[in-house]
Amino acid sequence: MKKIIAEIGSSHDGSFGNAMKLIEEAKKCGADFVKFQHHIAEFESLPNAPSPSYFKSEDRFEYFRRTSFDLEQLGTLKKLTEKLGMNFMVSPFSEEALDILKKLNVKFY
């Protein structure tokens, strides 16, 4: 049986409202899973560390800080996903990010 994963990643660009809308759009498209990324800047990068050119005027550290959701926000995204009958999946990029996913009982990471 095939499963469709809607890779949202960080395409919400730090907007919680956009993240909610992207989940709803994933449902309309028939997705079985929605997948986010969870970054915690302090555990992944240093302030003012060199960044790839696609980060434009923002360094990687600030980008991760601006686009990360807190525990409560992630919990709300998970609840909406499950309410719509999909599975919530997150890629953690540090052990600390994984700890947050475990607190939320995220099953897929």
Predicted segments with their positions:
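Glycine-rich anion/phosphate-binding loops
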Residues: D13-E25, L71-E72
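Active-site beta-loop-alpha junctions enriched in small/polar residues
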Residues: G9-S11, Q37-A41, F93-E95
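N-terminal small/glycine-rich loop or linker at the start of catalytic domains
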Residues: M1-D13, P47-A49, S57, G75
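Conserved, mostly hydrophobic/aromatic
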Residues: E7, A26, L101
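Short, conserved beta-strand segments within well-ordered enzyme catalytic domains
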Residues: I5, F33-K35, N87-S91
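Glycine-rich, proline-tolerant flexible connector loops at the mouths of alpha/beta enzymes
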Residues: D32-S68
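Catalytic domains of carbohydrate-active enzymes, especially glycoside hydrolases
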Residues: K21-H39, L104-N105
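Active-site beta->alpha loop and helix N-cap motifs at the rims of alpha/beta catalytic domains
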Residues: F55-Y109
